[in-house]
Amino acid sequence: MLEKPLIIFKAIILFFFFISFSYAELLSPNSTISPKEVIKIQLSGLQQNDLEYKDSGIEQTWKFAHPNNKRVTGPLSNFKMMIKSDSYGMMINHLSHTITELGSSDKWAQFEVIILDKDKIYHKFNWQVEKYTSEGTLKDCWLTTMVSSPIPLGSSI
């Protein structure tokens, strides 16, 4: 008699357990995330853009954009259009990426990023992050301030 309610209870617990993992929240900036990790988070999101939900990778990238960068690109809807444009569309669902530090200080870091897009073409970017120094929730967080236009490097085949 007690078996059936216990099985139902276990099924409900498992259901909510799996739901909580299938809709994981996006990562937010915090002062413990290194400059290179910021770029890894952004690129991993773009590599699996629709993993959590449609455009979750673009939204993840947006969360780590510097406020000055956000003022230039406009609201998230504009940022999504920019990332999906011909200029940056190769970042969406790319196959792989490498991140190489070019230089850094205690306030900025510059990286070379090479992406292999889904058409197996390599693209190089310069990616810069800066430490946010103003007061508020972003203080001392590393945030993206600049991503260059891509430089095509040719096919992997």
Regions found by a protein language model. Give the residues of each.
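Bacterial N-terminal signal peptides that target proteins for export
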Residues: 2-12
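Short solvent-exposed beta->alpha transition segments
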Residues: 52-106
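Exposed beta-sheet edge and beta->alpha loop/turn motif
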Residues: 101-157
